[in-house]
Amino acid sequence: MNHNTELNRSSVRCLFPLGQLVATPGALDLLDRTETNAQTFVRRHQHGDWGSVPSEDAEANQRAIETGCRILSSYFVNDTERLWIITEADRSATTLLLPEEY
């Protein structure tokens, strides 16, 4: 990795606070089984990469940053399993969960 790439990554600011970071048992199991580091997805979520959400949800997330509404991201951890990340409207907590746990 070159120095300019590192500078660009470090200069990207977080778009909103996460509050307390929590995960459901299903999310923890998925991350463990797939040997996936949750921080990668949390970082993407906090920097505005919403993953695999419909365009209307992505637009709602952008508005939510300004208006203080809930923010939802969805990421494929493997070919068939998704991880959702939801930051509460009041920014008190961010939860990692499976869609079926919602």
Where are these regions (language model features)?
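Charged, low-complexity intrinsically disordered segments
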Residues: 2-10, 17, 84-87, 97
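Short, compact, well-ordered microdomains
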Residues: 66-102
